[in-house]
């Protein structure tokens, strides 16, 4: 597993875990990964998360499925990456599927959804799209 872009690696682990119908996936923990996971849990895309270990922290992510065993996350895509950062002001924040999906944004007030960023009148770095 390449650690050139740890956020993209986390999103790939989530995507692959849902394709493999896993209940939980594990990724190395960091502050930004915990914040992104918290937003996805609040928006209902993931079931739960917890940080394991006291020396080397691991982020345990519980995946969420519909009753028909179909993953709740249909599409998850990394937008801003280390080689090409993508920043938008509050007026230019994109909408995913006309508001049906979520854009995760890293702002000066923390990691949040595009809807919350618009409400707080802040822009920031577009981390990923989730639908």
UniProtKB/Swiss-Prot annotation:
Lineage: superkingdom: Bacteria
SUPFAM superfamilies: Ribosomal protein S8
GO biological-process terms attached to the record: translation
Entry-linked Gene3D superfamilies: 3.30.1370.30, 3.30.1490.10
Keywords: Ribonucleoprotein, Ribosomal protein, RNA-binding, rRNA-binding
Family, per entry: Belongs to the universal ribosomal protein uS8 family.
Subunit structure: Part of the 30S ribosomal subunit. Contacts proteins S5 and S12.
NCBIfam families: PRK00136.1
Physiological role: One of the primary rRNA binding proteins, it binds directly to 16S rRNA central domain where it helps coordinate assembly of the platform of the 30S subunit.
Protein name: Small ribosomal subunit protein uS8
Gene from which the chain derives: rpsH
